Amino acid sequence: EKYNAIRALMMKSVAYKVPAVPARIPVIAIPKISLNKTVDVMTMVAGMKAVENDTPMTFEDLNQGTGYVLYRRHFNQPISGMMRIKGLADYAVVYVNGTKVGELSRVTDVDSMEVNIPFNGVLDILVENMGRINYGARIVESFKGITKPVTIEGNEITGNWQMYSLPMDRMPDMT
């Protein structure tokens, strides 16, 4: 209805002949698709070699343009409090000892959350690259991943970060 109303308005406003409406594209039947194999990210990284660094590395530092990076940090002492990732680009799911504890997002301006990491605990931060900024003043801020220090209660978490690149540019080996 809106299409025809706008078209009729245009026909009154232009001096040339408006072309005929194109024929409708036929709808086709798509057969049922069965997805019978799955693999979770934690299983995928179990067999991968991590890149290690004192601080989290960006996607660009890891020579990765798309997909996800899993940032992992082992703690030999318990730590709890407000975790802040001021330089998150773009979206992260946070796990402690394999259990999802929250989400952070540049889009919704959520860059902090409470964490409680027990003795010998593991913090996993799965960061998704949601695409590149390609216009405007923020075009120069196009680094992806964790781009600034991770802090808990204001203390920078350094040493022994492991990064697992998951570009999702090919099917994972699920054998």
Model-derived regions, located:
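Carbohydrate-binding surfaces of carbohydrate-active enzymes
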Residues: 1-174
